[in-house]
Amino acid sequence: LLLGFEGVDIHSDIYYATRVYSTLLGSGMSSRLFQEIREKRGLVYSIYSSGDFFSDSGIFYVYAGTGHKEVKELIPVLCDQLNIDANTFTQEELTKTKAKFKVGILKAEESISSRCRSNASSYLMHNKLRSPEEFIAKIDAVQLEDLEKARTKILESNLTVSSIGPIENLETVDSIKRRLS
């Protein structure tokens, strides 16, 4: 199951907040989605949020690998998680998420192929090479209210739902959209 939303482009004032929000929400075993939906409720095999960001557009999505019987219970729980006001996240969660993000950036600098990809992407998107320190400074500047701006923008955008397998237990797109406030 995939819930897809309009994202932001790399020039957006909430680009970095969107990246941090996605990481906090659904990147790794400590993420909110993994803990609530997989560990606590056992509704999925895998769950994560991510995004793709370009110079003129972007997408934000949540992926859930689940069975057709579990999808009926999954949708309301997933929507509840997406509806949580990011201002209620703790400062500790934000700090840990930023640290996780920064470790990934710095680890990537140790790989020649990752560094080449990063430099090429930076040059293509920004017409200049950007240092990891520049990126880290932008991540460090993100605050909880910025995460809420990103979350609100995501949920107010158009929703696309994609599913593989039996869909008799899957709600309509309109029904899912109504659950997202």
Predicted regions: what is each one?
Residues 1-32:
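His/Glu-based metal-binding/catalytic segments typifying zinc-dependent metallopeptidases
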Residues 5-7, 64-66, 163-167:
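Short beta-strand-to-loop capping motifs
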Residues 12-14, 70-73, 169-173:
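Short, conserved charged micro-motifs
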Residues 27-43, 54:
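M16/MPP (pitrilysin/insulinase) zinc-metallopeptidase core fold and M16-derived inactive scaffolds
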Residues 102-181:
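C-terminal regions of mature proteins
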